[in-house]
Structures are given as structure tokens and as C-alpha cells.
Amino acid sequence: MALARQVNKRVESREAFFSLEYAPPPSGKDKFKIANPLFIDVTWFERNDPGNLCVPNSSSSIAAICRELLAQPNVMLHLTCNGRTKVETMRYLRQALGKGIRNVLALRGDDVKGVEYTKENSFYATDLVQWARDIPEYKDELSVSVAGHPVGHPNCSSYSEHLQHLKTKVEAGADFVITQFFLEAEVFAQFKDDCRKIGINVPILPGILLFRSAVSLIRIAELSGVSIPSHIRKILEANKGNIAAVRNYALHHAYEMSRELLSKEITHGLHIYTMNQPESSGLLLRRLGLWQTVSVLEHQLLQGPLTKIVCKVIHVPVPKRTKVWDKRADYVAPYLTGKLPNGVRFTKCSHPVHVRFCSCFNGRSAALQRVSA
């Protein structure tokens, strides 16, 4: 099922959910296997050659890793279109689609230094949404989200102008909106109401920021055009230099704001800007009761039919086992040292013994059984 349909289904059923955003290179992403987010979001980091799959920590590489190694089907990749031609942007999009990524956050992106802008490389998020919708073979699979700014976009002349731009992106084919962070729950509530009044009826997910320090919050707020309320500034000033206290406050603030949004049913989904802080994000999700103890990998395996997999054991006579051969796999060492598991013994190469992997899930565990052929 396409991510857009899953989001709509959760909203219609009033079922709480969350998503996680990482900025390459992420840390502790494996810790979120058991959190079961609806989707994982990877930012487009221009300074790290984001579209190059040969760069281990590029945005595209991280998204592919989340998709393949974490068995997370819903991976969203940020994609910008400003400063490059349509052909270049579409190459990155098709590359992501080829890696199984079916979700993108369409963004214009910041101006790139040293780039001379012409009509061939100056585009907006609306253009990218339209390009994505023009790919016929992924029409029913591709989900496209766009960004919304609850206090208005810093490059727009007014708040109402931003709302009109957002409406244009939705009309171009965007499935849902993910907002920039905000610092008061009522700001998001008002933004959502204003969107509904002008006909923006797609789901709107609030962006919840877990800032790392007072300095980082001030910097991000300035870049985003977000005003920091006076009561928050006072708390940050009172704890100046105390990093632990500031992070604890950031967690408390995010919890109180999220709890209010969920309890009043202003939203049913939260988009967590993790700032690559798995511990803080995990604490927030636990306090909100959104942390699930079912692994993503197991959840996906149990959705389909269970299949038995049979493989034949490679038997190598003891005299022929050399150090070179031993290096082929770590599991050989116990057999050479005599430290064998109960019931396991050396056999001749002709012995009709196979190892059958039975996908017999009892709760959350699988069993390995040794049986005669």
C-alpha cells in the first residue's frame, strides 16, 4: 500500500502514528527497528554529494540502507530541484525509485553558491511535484509530500502568500504536507485551520523539533523565520552552558506540545526531527505511548506467507581444513576447536544430512532444525 494511503488511513481511523527524520550521516538508526515508525525520512545534504550512491553517507546511500537493511518499506527521501536541470533532478528521482524508494519530499532547496541561475536550472517544488506525477509506471506507488511553514516561509512577502504557494503544490499532486518546526501548539492549530479554509484538505503532519542546544535552536529558528517565545528564551538563558539541562528541557517541551496536539486531536501523526538523537527521540516516543516493541523486520515478514528455505551443509573433511579455508566464515571455528553444540558432530561428506530453516514463528522467534533428508 502506498504511503499516502497509509497516512490517510491512519488519519481517518484516528490512529496515532509518527515518522522520524534523519540528517546524514545518521547515528543509531538501528535502534529504531523496534520503534516501528510509519516512515523514515532522510534529508538532502548538499555538501555530501547527496545523489551519489558511491558515497557511503550520502543522502541517497542512507535512504537505500534504510530501505534494504532495515527492511523499512516506507523510506522518504528529500529531493531538491533548484540549481540543477530537470534532467539531473529526474535522474536522481529515478535512481531512488530503482532502489525501491517510493516516497519523496519535494523541495525547492536553497540557492547554491557559485551556480549561475537560468530558466534551465531555476525551479520550484511545484515543478518537482508535477515531474514526479508525470512518471506513469509509478503512478500508483509514488507518494509525494511537500513542506509547509506554520509561521510563513521566510522568502514569502506574507503568511497568506505562503498559503497560496502551498495550495499550488497540493493542487499539482502533493499527497500530504510536513510542516517546518514550531514552538507552540496553537501555532500549528491555527496553520491547519487556515489551510482548511482555503481548500488544502490533505493530511498535515506537524514537525516536532528536539533541539540539541540553545545555540542550535537560535540558529535554526533564524534560518526558518521562527520566533522563539520569550518564556522559552528565559529558560534557555537561565540554563546557559548546561547542555544536559537544555536537552532535558527540549525533551519536556516537545512532549508537552505533542501531547496537547494528540489529546485535542489536532493531529494524529507526528513528524519527529530527531537531530540524529536516538536516545531523546526514543524517550519522547515512550512518554507519548507511541513506542512499539514489534520490530520492523518481523512485522514485514509476518505480513506475507511463510516459506520454508532448505540449504545443504558444506561438509569438509577435517584433515583438509586449513587456516585459509577457516577464514571463509567465523562459524567454522567452533568445529575445529572441538567446542561443538549439543547434538552436533562431524559427518562424512556423503552423510545425508541437511539443514532446514523453518520459518515457524512462535511469537517473534524462528527456529533452526536439523533433519535427515
Which sequence ranges carry the predicted segments?
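Active-site beta-loop-alpha junctions enriched in small/polar residues
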Residues: E21-S27, T43-R47, H78-R84, G109-D111, ...
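Glycine-rich, proline-tolerant flexible connector loops at the mouths of alpha/beta enzymes
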Residues: P24-K29, I34-S60, R108-E120, A174-Q190, ...
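Active-site pocket-lining/capping segments in soluble small-molecule metabolic enzymes
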Residues: N8-R10, E120-N155, K197-L262, N276-P278, ...
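Generic structural signal for well-ordered alpha-helices
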Residues: A4, K31-F32, S59-A64, M90-R94, ...
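Conserved, mostly hydrophobic/aromatic
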Residues: E21, I40, A96, K169, ...
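Glycine-rich anion/phosphate-binding loops
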Residues: K29, C81-L97, F123
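Acidic (Asp/Glu)-rich catalytic clusters
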Residues: N8-S13, F32-N36, S60-Q72, L93-I101, ...
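Active-site glycine-rich loop that binds ribose-phosphate moieties when present
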Residues: N155-A172
